Amino acid sequence: AXGQDFMRF
């Protein structure tokens, strides 16, 4: 979410 888009996986 927001700046944590890299945690989508």
Curated annotation (Swiss-Prot):
It comes from the Eukaryota. The keyword Secreted applies. It is found in: Secreted. GO terms for cellular component: extracellular region. Keywords: Amidation, Neuropeptide, Secreted. The keyword Magnesium does not apply. One of its GO terms (biological process) is neuropeptide signaling pathway. The modification Phenylalanine amide is found at residue 9. Belongs to the FARP (FMRFamide related peptide) family. This is CalliFMRFamide-7. It comes from Calliphora vomitoria.
